[in-house]
Amino acid sequence: MFDRAQRDPSSAAWPGAHHSLAAELLRPSVIYAPAMLELAREVPVHAFAHVTGGGIPGNLVRVLPDRCDALVTRGVWDEPRIFSEIQQAGAVPDDEMEHVFNLGLGMLAIVPPEAALHAVDVVRAAGHDAWLVGEIVDGHGRVRLERRATPRR
């Protein structure tokens, strides 16, 4: 990426950033365990998906029964800027970005619809950003990412 984009790791992460590209790429992983344990105490969680390599589809599919699909709506959460920078610098198609990176959703919790708003509140109270990003519907064990134009909280 550095060669293709003609970027130096010590340069600003993006125009106006006050930290380097290297610092952004080496940002430590978020530890979700305490917040997810609290969520499990407060809400009947059906499943957790830790989104690592394989992106959202590759990790969420592991917790889906064969009779359900997960519909995830892009644009309802705040994607960290580094992902658009990587995509632009590498001319990476949307589909590849979705299958490689977590795009800012490091942990997904599947909860009953009636508990969803409370789940968001619990996770936010634990110090993490949280959004309602989709729903579970009848299906065949697939993850489908859809688009929404503007982020919402």
List each language-model region with its residue ranges.
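Glycine-/charge-enriched secondary-structure boundary and capping motifs
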Residues: 3-153
